[in-house]
């Protein structure tokens, strides 16, 4: 990028020049901006010494910690793209993602390095760097380099940042795929820089703020926590994996670290507000609360409002991974008494929105429902190595058909109305039900599989319906869940299962999802949490 083009790769360096002694990360592993920048520059120099080129992928698989952020920023400073992997993902899924992304370097920790077998790394990986004690000598036949040796600056430091264009690849974020295989969403430098610039313009944040890094680094919400904070000299509390759903630990962390900016999915905020852990005293430092990823029921939003300091701004942000945040809405007092969900609002700077009906015509009248199409710099170039997909073809035209149904309100704000397809949101994560079905069908005893969601919001649960192969023995729920957990992240493992004699079909011979659970099977459907 030219000097005139904003880029997230300059953020830590520019901030460190002004705030070297100020905290960049707080918590169990605190770092100042000076310390963090020195580490990043040393690691970036080592990457460049390997001969990495612009757009090369750098994978990161470890527990959440400041070194995870260090690996991300170092990859970007070297002109590479980061591929973040959640620490809780099963090895089989990690293997699939690594094979698709073909990274040249893997940053990991001792625990996750020990989980990898000889055949789990693709041939593209030439270097493995790990943090922790008792590191294995090799992973997949590749010697493991201690992280500390990379931080010592033996390769010098990066003095000249790479020249990048807005279209260059910054990250590959893997999401659930309808075909049963995760797909990588390409995030460009231009899109990332545009989002951070909008956030800085919209929010009055600076060096005195502390962001809560609640989201997993493989979730697009994390780009706000990390890069917005680094852009303004604020500190980040990277919420440990074990604390992400522990309301007591979260509430105490908010109080202890005096968190001023919170961003998460609504279900986490609902857990906090319905527990006795979060009190007005714990929340006293909060200056901004933002949420995204799923609908926030208005009664739950009212309960949150009552716990926060008077006047604390609440923001509803919207956008699939393919666009990151593309619309926003600052909650108004009257929104707390709506009968319908809070609006997803208006486009951010650099984004355009169009509502399209089934015939492809633009919808403008208030109340009329259509699919939301997003355009602008925020839109991904497409899915990694899936240029043949229809959505990728649309991306070539700079448009992302979201699959989300919306309508306009009288004032021009958008309201979310549901989905066109079988993609759902659970705890903010995008879940393609077809991927769960594909994983279930890998069990040798299952002939057919279908997945539905029971309930909504924080009470949403996945239920698997299946038929057995001829001659197969009965499968217990524990076995089914263990099987799915070997191929899927925890949030995609079904909570309950129902065995059917036959799968209901529509006139076209396809699974009739509307009849699942409605038709009376030969035996009563198993209640949630049981299997027959």
From Swiss-Prot:
Keywords: ATP-binding, Ligase, Nucleotide-binding
GO molecular function: ATP binding; ligase activity
PANTHER family in the cross-refs: FATTY ACID SYNTHASE, NONRIBOSOMAL PEPTIDE SYNTHETASE
Designated name of the protein: L-proline--[L-prolyl-carrier protein] ligase
SUPFAM superfamilies (alphabetical): Acetyl-CoA synthetase-like
Residue ranges of the region described as Disordered: 510-532
Protein purpose: Involved in the biosynthesis of undecylprodigiosin. Catalyzes the conversion of L-proline to L-prolyl-AMP and the transfer of the L-prolyl group to acyl carrier protein RedO.
Origin superkingdom: Bacteria
Reactions listed under catalytic activity: holo-[peptidyl-carrier protein] + L-proline + ATP = L-prolyl-[peptidyl-carrier protein] + AMP + diphosphate
Natural source organism: Streptomyces coelicolor (strain ATCC BAA-471 / A3(2) / M145)
InterPro entries in UniProt: AA_adenyl_dom, AMP-bd_C, AMP-bd_C_sf, AMP-binding_CS, AMP-dep_synth/lig_dom, ANL_N_sf, DltA-like
UniProt-listed Pfam families: AMP-binding, AMP-binding_C
Tagged with keyword Hydrolase: no
